[in-house]
Amino acid sequence: MDYEFLRDLTGQVLVKFSMGHEVIGHWLNEEIKGDLVKLDHIETAADGVRGSERQWQLPGHEYTLWLDGEEVMVRANQLDLDGDEMEEGMNYYDEESLCLCGLEDFLLVLKGYRAFITQ
């Protein structure tokens, strides 16, 4: 899972991830947007589920984050749409709408993100 933290001309932080993990970057850009309190909340929740069978979720406007003792899932809320709502022959391209990664790797990303936005 490769990623980079960037700043645009206005100074806003943008996060880009490698193929297969793009949704984590979209989630950080759309749902977190540099909110350190939200990062604290997620890291506290991760500590609470680490090594257990418990799960935790953080629904957002565009994406929902799920944590369990070993794994993280970021999923676009649009994937909750019922297939009956679509025209016949149409389907969603969801490669950039769902991602799984290890909890420890995800926490390293959040640590790097926090360091980048506070520098």
From Swiss-Prot:
Q: Could you say which protein family the record assigns here?
A: Belongs to the UPF0231 family.
The record, for InterPro entries, names: UPF0231
The name this protein carries in UniProt is: UPF0231 protein YPO3414/y0772/YP_0271
Pfam families (UniProt xref): UPF0231
Q: What organism is listed for this UniProt entry?
A: Yersinia pestis
